[in-house]
């Protein structure tokens, strides 16, 4: 039963909502299409706000699981009133009005859960005067949905959403002369189906949107109504709804993303099943589907305007135009199979894109605004992936809406998004990574993940760390040059992954061009843009990492330099102390010589030794001097002569050489001036005193870096 048939049937208004709830229209699934026969009891309740009393109304068609709610019926009547306000538009136009508005969320039902499409319109739509309202902000008269602000002033959909989300009036600069509603391919055969689907999908959208929970009838305002182009499919709602508030400011440029492709896919048959089809923006569908989708409410002339407005999303109206299937034209002929296919597609989507579906929210945030064309419209990617999952059900071509500038964006169902997948991995991966090869992934949100993982894994921050360890080794070796070399190596290692990423991106672009052939470049371009953004972000992180590592290396150098300076200062102090000790020892020896000189004949033999030591006061004593014997007693005298005991020599390296020297008593010093001819060596009493004198030389190993503790 088509929408026109249902709408043409006059219905008896009754004021009892109980009767409405009691008499739920039965859902009859025929082979050709799911037609709903409404019982006479299922009549609209009279709504005080409706200016029109006798309105042909689409009866609520509850699925077996979902009971009919009087509130829904009121909304249905209100929306039907709205649709009937202009000179009675064809039923297609009524659905046009109904579809762009976000649905209310009743509990989710199976593929063909049905509630009238009128539920999608908010209660405010019924308040519009019949004379044709004018937006109080932008003065426009063309809008898919009229809204009111807190003061009751009539606003267009865009201004109302902008005010609601941003708390301030929508700037006039954002005003566009084209309507922002989404295209719908609605033919008489599919009108009833679409009406069912809008109601059926409302539960999914609304149940998944936490933000629109407080406004059951008006959830569309904030959630899906905000861009009219926020054609978030039921699967998209989980992740994409967070985008909605952010995208609302960009409502003029439809953020419709993923749902576009799905809409194209399922537009003919899936309208009943998937709410996202109704909310799909017309960007991709615009050229071919505009006449189909906008029989009356939005003239096809606005489609080019929509293209211009949403050009970032429009990636390929040209290729998509050829690729956009003739299925919309074949809706009447292919009712049975499309419906069944829609059921299967919905099933697949619900499985893959259910509440458990995990999308990267960070990416979604990036994809929020189409105003910034550079941002990655992740939602479009998600939509394309989800539509791919349901591609088995229908042969329609997906046009993924991505902000990329390429003109071709439609992907055939059968093609898994191989092209976008290779690009994403390449961001993090080096040239050797298989990212250039196409990956088949059922959902693109997973595709968005790989770059992050590879950024963590492939982009090796480790090589710089290893280089830092080499810096430490070089520093410990004391070689500043080694540190600089390691710095150079480090910078090279850091540069190489970035260059590798750039090469990979280029290679991926080439591969994508080769792989696309008949496929959408739109997905590839969107992925490329995402890759570029992630690559730039990744480069920034690499630069920050390099800076931190360089700072660490500088700190290591500084600490090493400080250590070396401290060591040098300590060595100087030791040298000074050794010199002082040497001077003290020399003074002691001089004093000792004086004592010997003062002694009588008994000291005549020993006097030459001290007498000669003043001459040697400036000399450093080495252990080899023990073997030096004088032919002339008045000249070279070994410092150890006539010293009994052991000389302990301590080097600054804390080595101690204990040289036990037995000074022979026959070592006699003959003096020419002294007449004592004996060969006897006389040990003087001072020699028997125990003294520890340190004879130290500051000149190192052989020259007397050794501290000599002499027991005299």
Curated annotation (Swiss-Prot):
Bias-annotated ranges (Low complexity): 27-84, 107-131, 186-199, 379-414, 499-532, 596-616
Biased composition (Polar residues): 1-13, 246-261, 429-447, 484-498, 631-667
Protein origin, superkingdom: Eukaryota
A biological process term (GO) from this entry: cellular response to heat
Region annotation Disordered: where it falls in the sequence: 1-20, 27-135, 173-280, 377-533, 596-712
Keyword Zinc-finger: yes
One GO cellular component term noted in the UniProt record for this chain: nucleus
Coiled-coil blocks: 545-598
Description of the deletion phenotype: Leads to altered sensitivity to fluconazole, LiCl, and copper.
Keywords: Coiled coil, Metal-binding, Nucleus, Stress response, Zinc, Zinc-finger
Bias (Basic residues): 213-223, 268-280
Stored InterPro entries: Asd-4/GZF3_helical, Transcription_factor_GATA, Znf_GATA, Znf_NHR/GATA
UniProt induction comment: Induced via CAP1 during oxitive stress, as well as during biofilm formation.
Location (main, coarse): nucleus
Single Gene Ontology MF annotation: RNA polymerase II cis-regulatory region sequence-specific DNA binding
PANTHER family, sorted: BOX A-BINDING FACTOR-RELATED, TRANSCRIPTION FACTOR GATA FAMILY MEMBER
Name of this chain's protein: Transcriptional regulator GZF3
Organism: Candida albicans (strain SC5314 / ATCC MYA-2876) (Yeast)
């Amino acid at each position: 039963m088509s929408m026109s048939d249902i709408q043409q049937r006059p219905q008896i208004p009754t004021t009892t909502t109980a009767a409405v709830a009691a008499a739920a229209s039965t859902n009859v699934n025929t082979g050709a299409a799911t037609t709903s026969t409404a019982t006479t009891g299922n009549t609209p309740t009279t709504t005080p706000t409706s200016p029109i009393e006798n309105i042909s109304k689409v009866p609520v068609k509850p699925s077996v699981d979902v009971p009919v709610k009087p509130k829904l019926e009121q909304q249905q009547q209100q929306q039907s009133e709205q649709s009937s306000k202009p000179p009675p538009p064809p039923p297609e136009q009524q659905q046009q009005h109904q579809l762009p508005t976000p649905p209310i969320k009743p509990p989710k039902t199976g593929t063909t859960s049905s509630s009238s499409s009128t539920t999608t319109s908010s209660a405010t739509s019924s308040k519009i005067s019949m004379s044709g309202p004018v937006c109080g902000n932008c003065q426009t008269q063309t809008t898919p949905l009229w809204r009111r602000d807190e003061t009751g002033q009539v606003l267009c959909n865009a201004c109302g959403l902008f005010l609601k989300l941003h708390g301030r009036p929508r700037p006039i600069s954002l005003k566009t002369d084209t309507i922002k509603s989404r295209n719908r391919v609605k033919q008489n055969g599919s009108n009833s189906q679409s009406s069912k689907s809008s109601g059926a999908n409302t539960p999914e959208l609304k149940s998944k949107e936490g933000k629109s929970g407080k406004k059951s009838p008006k959830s569309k305002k904030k959630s899906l109504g905000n861009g009219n182009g926020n054609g978030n499919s039921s699967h998209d709602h989980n992740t994409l709804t967070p985008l909605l508030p952010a995208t609302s400011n960009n409502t003029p440029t439809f953020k419709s993303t993923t749902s576009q492709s799905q809409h194209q896919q399922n537009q003919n048959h899936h309208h009943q099943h998937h709410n996202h089809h109704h909310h799909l923006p017309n960007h991709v569908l615009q050229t071919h589907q505009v006449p189909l989708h906008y029989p009356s409410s939005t003239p096809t002339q606005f489609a080019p305007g929509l293209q211009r407005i949403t050009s970032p999303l429009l990636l390929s109206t040209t290729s998509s135009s050829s690729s956009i299937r003739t299925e919309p034209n074949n809706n009447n002929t292919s009712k049975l199979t499309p419906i069944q296919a829609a059921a299967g597609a919905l099933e697949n989507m619900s499985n893959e894109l259910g509440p458990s579906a995990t999308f990267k929210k960070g990416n979604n945030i990036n994809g929020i605004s189409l105003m910034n064309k550079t941002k990655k419209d992740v939602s479009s990617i998600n939509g394309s992936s989800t539509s791919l999952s349901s591609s088995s059900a229908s042969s329609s071509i997906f046009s993924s809406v991505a902000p990329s500038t390429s003109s071709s964006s439609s992907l055939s169902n059968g093609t898994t998004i191989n092209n976008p997948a290779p690009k994403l991995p390449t961001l993090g991966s080096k040239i050797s990574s298989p990212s250039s090869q196409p990956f088949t992934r059922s959902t693109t949100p997973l595709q968005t993940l790989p770059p992050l993982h590879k950024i963590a894994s492939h982009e090796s921050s480790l090589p710089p760390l290893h280089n830092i360890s080499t810096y430490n080794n070089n520093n410990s070796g004391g070689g500043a040059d080694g540190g600089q070399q390691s710095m150079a190596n480090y910078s090279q290692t850091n540069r190489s992954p970035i260059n590798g990423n750039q090469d990979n991106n280029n290679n991926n672009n080439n591969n994508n061009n080769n792989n696309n052939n008949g496929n959408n470049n739109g997905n590839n371009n969107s992925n490329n843009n995402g890759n570029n953004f992630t690559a730039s972000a990744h480069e920034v992180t690499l630069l920050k990492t390099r800076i931190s590592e360089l700072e660490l290396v500088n700190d290591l150098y500084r600490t090493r330099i400080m250590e070396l300076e401290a060591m040098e200062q300590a060595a100087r102090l030791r040298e000074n102390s050794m010199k002082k000790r040497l001077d003290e020892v020399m003074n002691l020896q001089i004093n000792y010589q004086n004592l010997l000189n003062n002694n009588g004949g008994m000291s005549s033999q020993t006097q030459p030794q001290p007498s000669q030591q003043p001459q040697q006061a400036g000399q450093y004593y080495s252990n080899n001097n023990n073997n030096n014997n004088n032919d002339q007693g008045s000249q070279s005298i070994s410092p150890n002569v006539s010293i009994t005991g052991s000389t302990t020599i301590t080097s600054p390296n804390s080595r101690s050489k204990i040289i036990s020297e037995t000074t022979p008593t026959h070592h006699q010093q003959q003096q020419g001036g002294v007449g004592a001819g004996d060969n006897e060596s006389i040990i003087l009493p001072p020699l028997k005193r125990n003294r520890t004198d340190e004879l130290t030389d500051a000149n190192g190993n052989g020259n007397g870096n050794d501290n000599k503790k002499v027991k005299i």
